[in-house]
Each structure stands twice: as structure tokens, then as C-alpha cells.
Amino acid sequence: IIKPSSEKSIFDLNKKKIVSIFKKKGVIIFKGFKINKSNVTKFTDIFTKQYANDAIRRNNRFKDKNLHDVDPGNYEMPLHSEASYSTSWPEIVWFYCNKAPKKSGQTTLCDGRAIYKNFNLDLKNFFLKNQILYDIIIPFKANKANPKIIKRTKNLRPWHIEYPGIYDCYINLKNNYLKYKLKKYALVKTRESDKVAFVNHLQIILNRDPQVLNMTLENNKKISKKIMDEIKKISNELTV
């Protein structure tokens, strides 16, 4: 947690020191700074080379193309890595709360390296060996694809995305969406620490994220309940 130690603004912080802390800790909370909502991206621009595309369903905030709402509602939001199934998977996620609620609304955090470290040998070997197969739909215009239309093959044209793991890709120009399959590991090797981390969307509740139609192993089999229960147990113990 970084708090102001004087009357200086958040823009006076030492960039190199902030980057160094972030590389070491993986998460920073800037607390107590006076920052206007119109200056949020002025600050994030200092540390951001490029902004990833967000889901079309999320509205812009404060007339800023790089600021978006989170999904509204009271649904449970299981642990996941933002957009891990897309070509726009971000390296950094910024959160800004303009008016904090008095109760609930917290963003959960968990270190994927710690999750993997706490896996037993069998579980580590399982995910080192097996890739996850995602069925994905990505709307690319504001008139989002109707779920009833998604299951049809009419108006689908073969498409191509140059991204390792994506195949069976199709585009629907009438209803403005892409459909594809993505194979990728549930594990990644982190750039800074050079350690393996458990980072994926395996714990989401299907039908809550409209872009993920299905998830299986690459042989089309479901991950066993025993494995999923162990993942959830370890993740819950490490989530703050």
C-alpha cells in the first residue's frame, strides 16, 4: 500500500521506484491520494504502453475510451485472470473506485505462483501436461450477438487470427461476432520472477461470462470434480 507522505500529488511519485515495487510485489494499492476521475488515465499512462481492448458489453466511464465499467450485479465472481482466453490478455490491470461502497465491493487478489506452489506433484504434472480447450465468442460491435444466434452456423465465414492456440475460427458479419477455439495451458512462466503460475479462467461459472461458451481438456473431457475441488480449496486459502 502506497500512501501520500506529504502534500505532493500522485503524479510526483518516483516512477522507477513504483515499477521496482510492482515487479517485486505484483500488486500496489494507491490509497489516500487526491486524484480526480478525469485524471485517472493521465496517471495510468505513465506506466502503460498500450491498453488492451475491453469487452464490448462494458460501457465507457467519464468520457474516457480507456476507462470501463466492471460488470454490474450481485453475482458471485470466482477467481480468474482478466481476459486470459483472448488475444487482449493484459499484463497489468488497473482498478479505480470513484465512490467506494460502505459494504462489500472489494476486488479479490491471489498470487498464481502461490497456487501452483501449493499443488501436490500429481496436480502440477496434470497441468504441465494438459492444455485447456476454450470455446469462445467475441462480439466486436455494440449490437452484441444474441445467445440464440450463437449456436447457429448460418452466416459464419472462415476467419483467421494469428495467435498461437486459436483454431476453428469463424466470423459473423451480420451479427458482429467472432467464434473460435483456443488451446492453452492453465500455467504460465512469469516474466519477472521466472516462476510457474496458475493463471486461467477454470474457476468461472459458465453462462456468467457471456464470452466463454465452454471449457474442457484438449481431449474434450471435463476436468474431474476432485481436481476442481482441490484447485478451489487452495485458491480460497490464498485469496485476499
Residue ranges and their predicted role:
Residues 1-10, 17, 62-66, 73-79, ...:
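Active-site environment of non-heme Fe oxygenases that use a 2-His-1-carboxylate facial triad
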Residues 1-83:
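N-terminal non-catalytic cap/leader segment that marks the start of a structured domain
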